[in-house]
Amino acid sequence: MVGMDLFKCVMMIMVLVVSCGEAVSGAKFDELYRSSWAMDHCVNEGEVTKLKLDNYSGAGFESRSKYLFGKVSIQIKLVEGDSAGTVTAFYMSSDGPNHNEFDFEFLGNTTGEPYIVQTNIYVNGVGNREQRLNLWFDPTTEFHTYSILWSKRSVVFMVDETPIRVQKNLEEKGIPFAKDQAMGVYSSIWNADDWATQGGLVKTDWSHAPFVASYKEFQIDACEIPTTTDLSKCNGDQKFWWDEPTVSELSLHQNHQLIWVRANHMIYDYCFDATRFPVTPLECQHHRHL
């Protein structure tokens, strides 16, 4: 009987793993992504893929599938040296004018000055929810991991698994939350010298082109959907690992990490910008330290 009980237990675990393992994880670039524009500026070197920006074009890539909830991660080494005027982005987005979007935007700077990481969130086409911070390392010398963890409870932006921003689901407070549109995963590099560096005061020096961002360790552990209109596979009663409270909510240690990031590296938070928002956005009233 003990042997039979053990067998049943193992089979139940296997069924659970299968039901929650419809995600896609760790793969080569071509398995998860494809060039979305300027194919000659997107170079797949096997383990590493590079996006190049010159005075002719930037470049970008996109995921082959769309997803509803899960975790996407990528390792990026940003443009070395003088990157002023350039923006490298890693983000998730749905389609259409009323789209949802989660953004990492890396704003280039002059040599010796720190990169600025800007995060932004769009829900139903409404954005303008920027936060900016300086990193606690040089992101141009080595690869670092940037992740977005998206569940029904929250959206968490992470750098090397350290949370830097959390957006909780506060629909019960009347605050919209991104939960009903499938998203693709994207990255791109482009010239944004009208605003990216010191408010547009520093322009791109094309004598330093090409500007190259490098990528590796492509991971998408998320619920892949068959069509953008059929979301039942991913938002029904079925439970995935990211639905567990121990995953979708920050631990005590992660909360301490987030507080440390905000205290030591945050340089802008839209919640405290009274010029842009004379009336404090509703979600800011409920995210005291987020």
From Swiss-Prot:
Major subcellular site: secreted
Molecular functions (GO terms): hydrolase activity, hydrolyzing O-glycosyl compounds; polysaccharide binding; xyloglucan:xyloglucosyl transferase activity
Cell wall biogenesis/degradation found in the keyword field: yes
EC numbers: 2.4.1.207
A Gene Ontology BP annotation from the UniProt entry: xyloglucan metabolic process
Disulfide bonds: C223-C234, C271-C284
Ranges of residues in domain GH16: 27-215
Residues under site feature: Important for catalytic activity: D103
Active site: E101 (nucleophile), E105 (proton donor)
Highest taxon listed in the record's lineage: Eukaryota
Keywords assigned by UniProt, alphabetized: Apoplast, Cell wall, Cell wall biogenesis/degradation, Disulfide bond, Glycoprotein, Glycosidase, Hydrolase, Secreted, Signal, Transferase
Reaction(s) catalysed by this chain's protein: breaks a beta-(1->4) bond in the backbone of a xyloglucan and transfers the xyloglucanyl segment on to O-4 of the non-reducing terminal glucose residue of an acceptor, which can be a xyloglucan or an oligosaccharide of xyloglucan
InterPro entries recorded: Beta-glucanase/XTH (IPR044791), Beta_glucanase (IPR008264), ConA-like_dom_sf (IPR013320), GH16 (IPR000757), XET_C (IPR010713), XTH (IPR016455)
Tissue expression notes: Highly expressed in shoot apices. In the vegetative and reproductive phases, it accumulates in the shoot apex region, where cell division is most active. In the reproductive phase, it is also expressed in flower buds, flower stalks and internodes bearing flowers.
Any one annotated GO CC term: apoplast
Top-level enzyme category: transferase
Glycosylation sites: N55, N109
Post-translational modification: Contains at least one intrachain disulfide bond essential for its enzymatic activity.
Binding positions (xyloglucan): E105, Q118, T119, N120, N128, R129, E130, D194, W195, G199, R276
Keyword Hydrolase attached: yes
Family assignment from sequence similarity: Belongs to the glycosyl hydrolase 16 family. XTH group 1 subfamily.
Role of this protein: Catalyzes xyloglucan endohydrolysis (XEH) and/or endotransglycosylation (XET). Cleaves and religates xyloglucan polymers, an essential constituent of the primary cell wall, and thereby participates in cell wall construction of growing tissues. Involved in internodal cell elongation.
Protein name: Xyloglucan endotransglucosylase/hydrolase protein 9
Species whose genome carries this gene: Arabidopsis thaliana
Record lineage: Eukaryota, Viridiplantae, Streptophyta, Embryophyta, Tracheophyta
